[in-house]
């Protein structure tokens, strides 16, 4: 049976895992733990949910569904990738050989160093104006940023 390692357990990683396992591929997801989705307080624009759902709940349900279909999850951070006879994803504790690897590690963003900011993520602090502007309609807001992206807001 062919095998695949998916690095990352966010929406892209879980989606890839679902398709792989349903195609009969031995599927393992390496995750270093909750990512950006976990910090979303309320998601109202996700297909299939009649009521708002938190990012943590959406992540939990997605992983639960993948496990139900046979996807294995390993909590470990990928630190290397090598190829000899097979691809091998390296972690600090173990190596995971596979026929294929998908890197679905998400995006990183530059976060300003403001004391207490991390505790407000998902509770008034947002990093996606297009995603979250609806929640702040009619309210006073402050925008912090620079460069071309800021000019599009």
Regions found by a protein language model. Name each.
Residues 1-5, 73-139:
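FAD-binding core/adjacent interface of flavoenzyme oxidoreductases
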Residues 3-29, 121, 128-153:
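Rossmann-like dinucleotide/flavin-binding elements
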Residues 20-22, 42-45, 88, 115-119:
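Short, glycine/charged-enriched secondary-structure capping and boundary segments
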